[in-house]
Amino acid sequence: MKITYKSAGVDVDEGQRAVQLMKNHVKSTFNSNVLADIGGFGGLFSLNIKDYKEPVLVAGTDGVGTKLKIAFMMDKHDTIGQDCVAMCVNDILCQGGKPLFFLDYVATGKLVGEKIAQIVGGIAEGCRKAGSALIGGETAEMPGLYAENEYDLAGFAVGIVDREQIITGANIKAGDIILGLPSNGIHSNGYSLVRKLFFEVLDMKITDYVEEFGTTLGEELLKPTKIYVKEILSLIEAIPVKGISHITGGGFFENIPRILPENVDAKINVDAWQIPPIFKFMAEKGNMSKDDIFGTFNMGIGMVVVVSKEDVNGAIAVLNKAGQEAHIIGEVVEGAKQVIL
C-alpha cells in the first residue's frame, strides 16, 4: 500500500489553492512599508520612524474563543477574521500603539480553500479598518487534532508608539472622567456562557428570530467586534488621554482596574448608556446578577477612556468628529483599584 501525505489527511494541493484564493485579500492590506510579496519565509516591513523620538514597538496576540462555534453553526466565515484583528489591535491601542502589521494563524482538521479564503477575507477587512498590513500567516491542516469542519484562529498585531507617549494609566487621579465607547454587541468573549444559555438552557436554534434583537439569534451572536483604531488614534493626537481599557474577558471588573493606580476606584453609572437588548435578555433568562454579567461581558461598552475633567468635552468632540459615539459613564474617585457600579 502506497502512503502519501494526502492519504494521511493533508492535501498540499488544496493548501496551494487556498493561497491563490486568499492572495487578493492579503494584497489589499499592503502599503508602501511592505517589502515582500506573499510566499516568503518571513514578512518584511520597513519602519518609518522619522516622526518618533524614541520609537517603541507594542505587540499583542489573541484569538476569538468559542465564538468560532457560532461561525461553524451558521457556516459563515467572512466576519470571524475581523474579530481576531479587533481583539489584537484594540489591545495594543490601550498603550497608545498605532498598528503597523498583522499575522494570522489558522489551523483546521480539513482544509477547504474557499472557507480559508473567507476567513482571511475577514482578517483583511479588519486590517484595512485598522490601517494594518497583513504581512504573513500560517494555515495548518491537522487531521486527527481538529474536527474536519472546524478550525482555530489566532492573530498577532505589532504597533508603534513614542516612548514618552505610552499610555499607562499612572497619571489617573480622583476627579478624572470615564468615557465609554459603544460596542457592537457581545464582541468576542463570554461565548461559552452564551452557548450554554441559548443552546442548552433555553434550547434555542441559531436560526430563531428574536424579537428583542430584531434579527436571528445567529446574526446577533456573530456581529463582528468593533475596531476602534482610527477613532482612538484621532483622540490620542488631540487630547492627553490618561488611560484606555479594552473591555473583553472579565468585563468591567477585570479590565478597568488594569489601568487604575492603587489609590483610586472607577465609579460607573450604569444608567449613563443604553444597555443593548442582548445583555438584558441574557441577564433575565440566565438569572444573572449585575456583578455576574458586568464581570463577564462588555454590556454595550467596548472601550473605556479616562481623561481629565477639563478635557472631557474636547475628547467627546474629537470622537464624534471621527464618527464615534461616546458617553460619560463614570468618574475616578479615591479608593483601592476597584470598580464600583
From Swiss-Prot:
Pfam families the UniProt entry points to: AIRS (PF00586), AIRS_C (PF02769)
Species name: Alkaliphilus oremlandii (strain OhILAs)
Record pathway: Purine metabolism; IMP biosynthesis via de novo pathway; 5-amino-1-(5-phospho-D-ribosyl)imidazole from N(2)-formyl-N(1)-(5-phospho-D-ribosyl)glycinamide: step 2/2
GO CC annotations, alphabetized: cytosol
Predominant location category: cytoplasm
Protein name (Swiss-Prot/TrEMBL): Phosphoribosylformylglycinamidine cyclo-ligase
Catalytic reactions on record: 2-formamido-N(1)-(5-O-phospho-beta-D-ribosyl)acetamidine + ATP = 5-amino-1-(5-phospho-beta-D-ribosyl)imidazole + ADP + phosphate + H(+)
Top-level EC class: ligase
EC number: 6.3.3.1
